[in-house]
Amino acid sequence: MESLIIKLVPFLKVLFAFVLMLAGMRFKVGLGLSILAGSLAMAFMFGLGPIQWAEAGAVALIQDKFIYLTAIVGLILILSDAMERAGQSKRLMESLSGFLTSPRLRLMFFPALIGLLPMPGGAVFSAPMVKTAAEGMTIKNRDMAVINYWFRHIWELFWPLYPGIILTVALADIQIIDLIAYTWPGTPIMLVAGWFFFLRPGVLDTKDLAMGPLPTTRSKSAAFKEGLPLLVAIVGAIGLEGAIAAFMPSIPFELGVIVALALSVVCVMVQNTQLGLKFLKDVLSKKSLWSMVFVIVAIFVFKDVMLAAGVVEEMARVAGGGAALFASAVFLPFLVGMVAGINVAFVGATFPLLLGILSSLGMQDQTIPYLVLATFAGFTGVMISPIHICFILTCQYFNCDLGRTWRKLVGPCLVFLLSGIGVFWFLV
């Protein structure tokens, strides 16, 4: 009994830090401050003093990844604000109305489309489009938030441009096709779960989706013109990422995303000359932009404090004995995914341990099934994470209560995890 309690100690510490963060969010302390408080509590519980906490936080804010993410989110907000202010988002929705006649399809279409663009914080890109698609409907903000958040991530276990997939195949020394040939069920599972929990009749009543008469014309040229900035962002980012990976692998892929987003902003301003340079000055002085930046600061501080305090290593150390394989394939990926809120974190932190255990047990022939199980478990943790940047930014955009919105994710995430276990048992 005593040894069990000792093994649970690091997990209970992490749980306490999360409870503290959620309490701060609940009592309107603010997202950024709540996450910083959680990082400080975690630092103290894992042996870091206030000076070490500050040093870890300072290191986080000079990393390339932080600078790139801040630039990406900033450009996304500028682009979405420009399209909204110029009325282009509304015109785009009107031009697509003849193609997207189902209100439910309209709500999920743009998050799913933007999900093909593997960029951090991408849910804030599609959030204004969901808001525009929902105009005239009587849908609660938290419902729009979960629809945007969930359908933005339906491709992450299948789309080969996502960094989590790329890192997994690099660590396991396998081909991408060997992995996604078994992880692809994650996409239809998320589609079905998203429809059942967020979109089906009974969850969203038909009367809530009632709208005025939709245009019956289908103008491909109008849709192309109004959607050109999005095409520049998506196709440009994917193309530049591919070019960088093929010809300049030493250059961070985020630079391709930044260039594509900057070009899409230029595209909007050329198409809508009335915006002018005054628009840029106005958007850069908006409080909402800098609130988002502060949240990103807090998330990066939390991530680096977690690394500096050796949180993952401590959890892995106590998960030994007969529980090691289960812990490394399910529990640790889930927990690290939930703590960090990004795929690369659970892959990089726990997959080397999992691969090492499989090797030590002579189970290399079971590598793919266990990687699939760990991927489903880790991604479930990422999706349920209250500090997932897409979740936080989406809730911030729709101005909805984070706790109440988070509770709506428990059901579909449980279904997703159980489905992943089912896929694993099928493979073994």
What are these regions (language model features)?
Residues K7-L12, Q63-L69, S95-M108, M137-M144, ...:
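Membrane-interfacial loop-to-helix junctions in multi-pass transporters
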Residues K28-L31, I67-L69, S80-G87, G115-P128, ...:
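Short helix-coil transition sites and intra-membrane helix breaks within transmembrane domains
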Residues M1-A60, F66-Y68, W195-E314, W425-V428:
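Hydrophobic transmembrane alpha-helices of multi-pass small-molecule transporters
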Residues K65-V73, A112, D178-L191, M248-A262, ...:
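Alpha-helical transmembrane segments
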Residues R91, G122-A134, Y162-A172, A345-S359, ...:
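Re-entrant/interfacial helical elements at transmembrane boundaries that shape
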